[in-house]
Amino acid sequence: MGVKAPVAVRVNPNVEAGTHKYITTGKAENKFGVDFERIESLYEMAARELLNLHLKGLQMHIGSQLTQAKPFLEAVRKVAPLAASLKEKHGIEFFSIGGGIGIVYQGTLDSGVQEWWNEDCAQLTLSTYAQAVVPTLQPLGLHIIVEPGRLIVGNAGALITRCLYEKNGKAKTFKIVDAGMNDLIRPALYQGYHEIIPVREYPSESCVTADVVGPICESGDFLAQN
């Protein structure tokens, strides 16, 4: 067809994201991206031998649910000179710096109001993020792509479940519900916090400390502990 495929290569900058190890994606031991030191030679080879490709950009993503600007700044500062070099040598047009801006999970009761994302609640906001990375990115003269992800849709849904049984064990009380890790895996896999609130009001004196667990046949099937 005579059409060149536009491509961008993902670089692994080997930067610590400061998030859960399962959603850290920019360290040398992670499976994602091409080693930082190999990128320039890879682009040179592609420009020389893979003439059906159009080298359009460079991409990175260091992890998810980051709550500080420092890792983003460290990654951008490390990769920006590489992006500038690729622009000069190969004419790349964009630099995608990935996503990963974390959100607040503890404020679920207020998640229906705009203020949920404000400076008082969020550890990392769009303004602090931009203040950190823009000064390094602006001189590149490239289109900058960002992937906001959960920052946009994190409070868009709720899981509604029903308590089926209460088990009073010797060491713990368990509230067994009709939803589990197959519906919401973050607590079990990432030790993620999700606030649980009753749909109907109950007297405060009826509250007990318990694990909220699902029906899946393994001990990791929980939505909240204690």
Give the residues covered by each predicted segment.
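Flexible glycine/acidic-rich beta-alpha junction loops that bind and position SAM and/or redox cofactors
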Residues: 15-19, 93-114, 145, 150-156, ...
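Short secondary-structure boundary segments
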Residues: 33-48, 113-129, 194-198
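Residue-level signature of transmembrane alpha-helix interfaces in integral membrane proteins
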Residues: 26, 75, 112, 116, ...
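N-terminal low-complexity, intrinsically disordered patches enriched in charged
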Residues: 35, 42, 66, 72, ...
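Acidic, glycine-rich loop-and-beta core segments that form the ion-binding/anion-interacting portion
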Residues: 73-144
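Charged (often Lys/Glu-rich) extended helix/loop segments that serve as interaction or gating elements
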Residues: 126, 132-226
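Active-site-proximal beta-alpha core segment in soluble small-molecule metabolic enzymes
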Residues: 1-96, 103, 164-166
